[in-house]
């Protein structure tokens, strides 16, 4: 496996949607994510058109994962790694790239019952800053990462 970070191009949207549907369907099998595929495609297109940075993790020609970052606010609207690439460092690679893009800080929300994602974000230095309910009444954790302050230089 050789994963690289690449810029979003519209021709990759179907593969991104495939990864999104398969991962979310596994996490929440009672929800029909295939029926939400068009929403996802519209969402990614709107984010890209509004100035968000959309980055892909690619393994050869395959889309392994993706992250979106609003460079003005640091908001991560979408982050996902496909099932075949989970647990292989792809998410960490995407997050490190997002941190370099927005060293002032990043924010995101995550389903509060998604223990695996929350543990990943905590390992990446994110802290829980609050909680809210989404439109379906599901608890959502709000999380933020701030770049550590520069180390002080020794005084001479």
Model-derived features with residue positions:
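Short hydrophobic/aromatic beta-strand or adjacent loop that forms the aromatic wall/cage
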Residues: 52, 137-143
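Acetyl-CoA-dependent GNAT
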Residues: 7-84, 95-97, 101, 134
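Conserved N-terminal entry element of GNAT/NAT acetyltransferase domains
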Residues: 1-11, 147-156
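Conserved active-site alpha-helix within GNAT-family acetyltransferase domains
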Residues: 92, 113-130, 135-139
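Active-site acidic-Proline motif in GNAT/NAT acetyltransferases
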Residues: 82-84, 88, 112-113
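Active-site beta-strand termini and strand-to-loop segments that position acidic
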Residues: 58-60, 144-148
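Conserved GNAT acetyl-CoA-binding A-motif
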Residues: 101-113
């Amino acid at each position: 496996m050789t994963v690289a970070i690449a810029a979003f191009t519209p021709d990759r949207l179907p593969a991104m949607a495939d990864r999104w549907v398969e991962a979310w369907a596994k996490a929440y099998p009672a929800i029909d994510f295939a029926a939400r595929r068009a929403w996802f495609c519209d969402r990614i297109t709107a984010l890209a058109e509004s100035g968000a940075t959309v980055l892909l993790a690619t393994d050869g020609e395959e889309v392994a994962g993706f992250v979106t970052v609003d460079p003005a606010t640091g908001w991560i609207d979408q982050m996902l790694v496909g099932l075949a690439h989970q647990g292989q460092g792809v998410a960490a690679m995407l997050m490190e790239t997002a941190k370099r893009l927005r060293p002032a800080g990043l924010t995101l929300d995550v389903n509060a019952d998604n223990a695996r994602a929350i543990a990943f974000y905590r390992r990446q230095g994110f802290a829980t800053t609050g909680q809210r309910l989404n439109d379906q009444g599901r608890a959502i954790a709000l999380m933020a990462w701030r770049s550590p302050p520069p180390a002080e230089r020794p005084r001479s």
